[in-house]
């Protein structure tokens, strides 16, 4: 057991928008520590969003993340030789990180176009409550709803 709870690291805000959420997105997009490339991708995606939607890309991104955030998820719990999928509420920091992760994964899964275009498309889709990331959230909620009978196994 730990002596005390591990502290959450503070992520410095990104240089262009001065926003922690955008910094988290950049860190999720980043591969092999290549942050400059990740920043170009994210800011390029934001430019595309600004161009296509004629709205502040930061507000669009914030709303997209808000739309993708899951409320419930299932966690496996072993009880007497059987493993049950127990629905539990998702804590706020995990909600945000899951939402960003799902948006980036959905963008990466698309094929044949530059990443900034795919990311912009996925953020706009999430803003409009459509797209792969929203589908992932709905699937997670459906799983939790289906396993509602095991909710009393929560810990």
From Swiss-Prot:
Highest taxon, organism lineage: Bacteria
BP terms from Gene Ontology: translation
Entry's Gene Ontology cellular component terms: small ribosomal subunit
Cell membrane in keyword set: no
UniProt KW keywords: Ribonucleoprotein, Ribosomal protein, RNA-binding, rRNA-binding, tRNA-binding
GO MF terms held by the record: rRNA binding; structural constituent of ribosome; tRNA binding
Stored InterPro entries: Ribosomal_uS7, Ribosomal_uS7_bac/org-type, Ribosomal_uS7_CS, Ribosomal_uS7_dom, Ribosomal_uS7_dom_sf
Tagged with keyword Ribonucleoprotein: yes
Quaternary organization: Part of the 30S ribosomal subunit. Contacts proteins S9 and S11.
Entry's family note: Belongs to the universal ribosomal protein uS7 family.
HAMAP family cross-referenced by the UniProt entry: Ribosomal_uS7_B
Function: One of the primary rRNA binding proteins, it binds directly to 16S rRNA where it nucleates assembly of the head domain of the 30S subunit. Is located at the subunit interface close to the decoding center, probably blocks exit of the E-site tRNA.
The protein, known as: Small ribosomal subunit protein uS7
């Amino acid at each position: 057991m730990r002596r005390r709870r591990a502290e959450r690291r503070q992520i410095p805000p990104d240089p262009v928008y001065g926003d922690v959420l955008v910094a988290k997105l950049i860190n999720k997009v980043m591969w092999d520590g290549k942050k400059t490339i990740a920043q170009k991708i994210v800011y390029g995606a934001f430019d595309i969003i600004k161009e296509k939607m004629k709205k502040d890309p930061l507000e669009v991104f914030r709303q997209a993340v808000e739309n993708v955030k899951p409320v419930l998820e299932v966690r496996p719990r072993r009880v007497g030789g059987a493993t049950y999928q127990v629905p539990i509420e998702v804590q706020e920091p995990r909600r945000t990180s899951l939402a960003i992760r799902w948006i980036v994964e959905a963008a990466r899964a698309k094929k044949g176009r530059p990443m900034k275009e795919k990311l912009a498309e996925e953020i706009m889709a999430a803003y409009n409550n459509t797209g792969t990331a929203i589908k992932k959230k709905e699937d997670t909620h459906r799983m939790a709803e289906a396993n509602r009978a095991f909710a009393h196994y929560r810990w």
